[in-house]
């Protein structure tokens, strides 16, 4: 059994890790979830803020845990929004610390484009993007990395209450958060030994 510390209390992230290890490494996992609350890290990382926030959550988890050698891996998973000229791009950053050999690995991927093509089905998208921009302008100085206090999913859920705030991409873009994370874990597969 692989023992993991997850720098999150997200059930989606926990279940994704369990499924990925079962399917790809043919093993079961035991996961200890740790909530990392840091007022300097933005709830919604933007641009490079996702990778940096992911790194900080990993570092904070390592500092917070006693007896790390009881575990095989410490994992941090963070979604962020990259702002491009004509679209928003949701990506996943994953950082893994192999406790036994004291090495860290990272990958970014799972790209999901939020473009003007969604306007036909989601006419309130400009309002969502405007509110994200306003949140950024009001709160980005509160954080050490690029980001804001309202997540894109929370804003989507405000305008479309039937869309889950933690898995908005499944409804808007047809890609489930779980499969998005699994794709990035696949990139790290060769680094993870059991």
Model-derived features: where do they sit?
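N-terminal polybasic phosphate/anion-binding patch
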Residues: 1-71
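Anionic-ligand binding patches
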Residues: 42-194
